[in-house]
Swiss-Prot record:
One GO cellular component term noted in the UniProt record for this chain: cytosol
Motif position, 'KMSKS' region: 579-583
Keywords, ordered alphabetically: Aminoacyl-tRNA synthetase, ATP-binding, Cytoplasm, Ligase, Nucleotide-binding, Protein biosynthesis
Top-rank taxon, per record: Bacteria
GO MF, any single term: ATP binding
Keyword Zinc-finger: no
Source organism of this protein record: Campylobacter jejuni subsp. jejuni serotype O:2 (strain ATCC 700819 / NCTC 11168)
GO BP of this protein: leucyl-tRNA aminoacylation
Record family assignment: Belongs to the class-I aminoacyl-tRNA synthetase family.
Name of the protein this chain belongs to: Leucine--tRNA ligase
Keyword DNA repair: no
Gene: leuS
Length: 809
């Protein structure tokens, strides 16, 4: 009977669905595994990146389910966001209709691949029920001071007409549409992620050896903790008159280089710069250039060529009394430290580049034979008055102490991470549950009024926020004073939704109507045991999710410190050496692969072609090869004895049979390591292929039966449909359980030993594994007799199971 993928796969998908085979059990005393792949945006079709992500997760979920764990393996859709609005403009379709039509199609595609997702816990973040509890979290955070409003410069995308978080600006462009981003002053809501900066940094230690080092490093750098000195510099008298300011604050991590300061660099937004601008004390050319800098995103400023302009004013060095020129510079950010940087060109590369460009003084204060700039924190101070000849660290501590003693500075800790702006001027998002009242100011909605849902009678034009233009939706009554008021028309950044969906999945779906998170079930299921997704989410999603976990813990919703215990970042799927994309014309449609070869072939290829963390190059020939392997497995199984296993006696097997059985059990042993630790599915599949090849040389019915019993067990998480089909036919699926190794299979009948004389290999021989040490040494001498002739043996060394070494003279 020929292998018919479509019939087999549809049959088993129906059986699994009807029997709710993949739903988590209610028994919370069972050992648990929560396996989660990052949920998709419902763009309309799944791509090979999705297939890879979900195949890895599904293999792990199926494995743990099979060996007796209570497994939660959910799926949902990150369904708010700009693409739905863009589609509404392009195709004249409502964002909601576009989104839910896509969800319906993608669900069909995902389940056609045999993924063992829980259907009962499926959700979309645009569902009103999800919005209700998200708005509840927002209000609770607002009441605790974790969300606040402020007017600030924001990253503004002219194309999408919305605000972007710093993390969403890539090389000065919108991460979503690629349009140039400008700086714009706007009011908005901010999440106080900085309140958790220290904990977010400290808890990265808990994730070492469980998360990729690259992700940990990226988060550590993004949080950007720095300890240093914050101090005041007085302005000279003329500068005080010009700026209407008497002093400015500066932060430095290198107090030891304080005597090397040759200029102070200010952010364009600094109060002193703004005062000069407001009094028209800067010429038009400088004014125009400052405006250009102000329109750059923080990342652009950091990466572009260093530029600056002398402001014509001076500060007084707090220790030496020297006059220091003040410059405005594009590399200084207003919200890091005080928006002012003390520049030490001799010992900082950026400062050196700037000073060289503008011919500013370069004062060396650390002794070195190396070329400047010398940036090491090693060496003795010079040109630093009473601190000369101190090493850098000692000098740093003493200088800080002197500033504190004089009450002109203090030790401080700064973080590079900024609070998260979550206001978005778009329609298709979760409405921010706040009210603007002329009498009361900003007031939260009452919890009983949630969810605040979107009106459906809107015109999506791409110009501004449709909620602002709606004739009635904004109108409401202030819950505090009872007067007429207006709803907030901004919606939430979609990363707000994806920052807690994993906890919602962990909550018993029977409680979803009543509460955001069910305490009992989230305590049992959280944290996620294995999280799978792309490295591109290292800073954005993963950092926000970690913050949310801690914030919800402190609000009493959760108990764990971290949301994801282990993280796997899978590599991209490439074709012709490039990421698959429509513009490159190198997209492979998963539907076509399933139709031609079946879902199991797609899954097998995906897991066999490369280790999960590495990039995967699409190869049509390798897909054909995967299909041929499944056909071969299916054909071979037709001749396997059905029913209960016939007991095998190891001592009754011949050499070839023992070797084949060893290969089968080696594959089983490897499966434990692969599923629990390395995820190197390619090596596991190769081990199964090797075992089947060895088995083909044997004619032992009982051995073949045992081998298929084990191999179908190993491969079921990878190619589930065909393994269920064959296992039901042969063993009534009794092989789908935790299998044990048989130690006697690994005991070798003979040993292959090498013989070395004075460390040089001279011979090899085979001997019974039951031979005594004396017998082995005697056999070794016999095999090396010609090298021993006329010599005396000084020492005999036997390294058990490996070699004999004879020392002669």
């Amino acid at each position: 009977m020929a292998y018919e993928a479509s019939l087999i796969e549809k049959k088993w998908q129906k059986i699994w669905d009807e029997n709710e085979y993949f739903e988590p059990k209610d028994d919370l005393n069972l050992p648990k595994k929560y396996i989660l792949s990052m949920f998709p945006y419902p763009s309309g079709r799944i791509h090979m990146g999705h297939v890879r992500n979900y195949t890895i997760g599904d293999a792990l979920a199926r494995y743990y389910r099979k060996i007796g764990f209570n497994v939660l393996h959910p799926i949902g859709f990150d369904s708010f966001g700009m693409p739905a609005e863009n589609a509404a403009i392009k195709h004249k379709i409502h964002p909601k209709s576009w989104t839910y039509e896509n969800i319906a199609y993608m669900k069909k595609e995902l389940f056609s691949l045999g993924f063992s997702f829980s259907k009962k816990r499926m959700l979309a973040t645009s569902d009103p029920l999800y919005t209700k509890f998200e708005q509840e979290f927002f209000i609770k955070m607002f009441e605790k001071g974790l969300i606040y409003t402020k007017e600030a410069n924001v990253n503004w995308c002219e194309q999408d007409q919305t605000v972007l978080a710093n993390e969403q600006v890539e090389d000065g462009k919108c991460w979503r549409c690629g349009h140039e981003v400008v700086q714009k002053k706007m009011p908005g809501y901010y999440v106080k992620i900085t309140a958790y900066a220290e904990e977010l940094l400290k808890d990265l230690e808990e994730l070492k050896d469980k998360w990729p080092n690259q992700v940990l490093t990226m988060q550590e750098n993004w949080i950007g903790k720095s300890e240093g000195l914050e101090f005041s510099l007085n302005l000279d008298e003329e500068s005080k008159q010009k700026t209407k300011e008497s002093s400015l604050e500066v932060f430095t991590t290198r107090a030891d280089t304080i005597y090397g300061v040759s200029y102070i660099a200010l952010a364009p937004e600094h109060k002193i710069v703004q005062n000069l601008l407001s009094q028209n004390l800067l010429n038009q050319d400088v004014l125009n250039k400052i405006k250009v800098i102000q329109n750059q995103s923080p990342r652009e400023r950091q990466s572009s060529e260093k530029e600056g302009y002398f402001l014509g004013i001076y500060a007084i060095h707090p220790l030496s009394g020297e006059k220091i020129p003040l410059w405005v510079a594009n590399f200084v950010l207003a919200d890091y430290g005080s928006g002012a940087v003390m520049a030490v060109p001799a010992h900082d590369e950026r400062d050196f580049e700037f000073a060289t460009k503008y011919n500013l003084a370069i004062k060396q204060v650390i002794q070195t034979q190396e070329n400047l700039p010398y940036m090491q924190k090693l060496g003795k101070l010079i040109n630093s008055q009473e601190f000369d000849n101190l090493d850098c660290n000692e000098a740093r501590l003493k200088i800080i102490s002197q500033f504190e003693a004089k009450n002109i500075g203090k030790r401080v800790v700064n973080f590079k991470i900024r609070d998260w702006g979550v206001s978005r001027q778009r329609y298709w998002g979760a409405p921010i549950p706040m009210i603007k009242c002329q009498s009361c100011g900003i007031v939260p909605q009452k919890l009983e009024n949630l969810p605040i849902t979107l009106p459906e009678d809107v015109q999506i034009t791409g110009e501004g926020n449709p909620l602002d233009k709606h004739p009635t939706w904004k109108n409401c009554i202030c819950p505090k004073c009872g007067k007429e008021a207006q709803k907030e028309s901004d919606t939430l950044d979609t990363f707000f939704e994806s920052s807690w969906y994993f906890a919602r999945f962990a909550s018993d779906e029977k409680t979803w109507q009543e509460k955001a998170l069910d305490e009992k079930s989230v305590k049992y299921w959280m944290s996620v045991d294995q999280y799978i997704g792309g490295i591109e989410h290292a800073i954005l999603h993963l950092l926000y999710a970690r913050f949310f976990q801690k914030a919800l813990r402190d609000l009493g919703y959760l108990t764990q410190n971290e949301p994801f215990d282990r993280l796997l970042t899978q590599g991209m799927v490439l074709k012709d050496g490039a990421k698959m994309s429509k513009s490159k014309g190198n997209v492979v449609d998963p539907d076509e692969i399933i139709e031609k070869y079946g879902a199991d072939t797609a899954r097998l290829f995906i897991l066999f072609a490369a280790p999960p963390a590495k990039e995967l190059e699409w190869n049509d020939d390798a897909v054909e090869g995967a299909y041929r392997f499944i056909c071969k497995l299916y054909d071979r199984a037709q001749n396997v004895k059905k029913g209960e296993l016939v007991e095998l006696k190891q001592e009754n097997l011949n050499k070839e049979e023992k070797y084949a059985r060893l290969k089968v059990y080696e594959a089983l042993k490897k499966s434990f390591e692969v599923y629990h630790q390395s995820f190197a599915f390619n090596t596991l599949i190769a081990a199964c292929m090797e075992a089947l090849n060895a088995l083909a040389l044997c004619k032992n019915e009982a051995l073949e039966q045992e081998a298929f019993y084990i191999i179908l067990n190993i491969l079921e998480p990878i190619i589930p449909h065909v393994c269920f089909e064959l296992s039901e036919e042969l063993f009534k699926c009794k092989n789908f359980k935790k299998l044990e190794l048989k130690e006697e299979v690994f005991v070798k009948d003979t040993l292959n030993l090498a013989v070395s004389i004075n460390g040089k290999k001279r011979a090899e021989f085979e001997i019974s594994s039951s031979a005594s040490k004396e017998e082995i040494l005697a056999f070794a001498k016999e095999n090396t007799a010609k090298w021993l002739e006329g010599k005396s043996i000084v020492k005999e060394i036997y390294v058990e199971g490996k070699l004999v070494n004879l020392v002669i003279k």
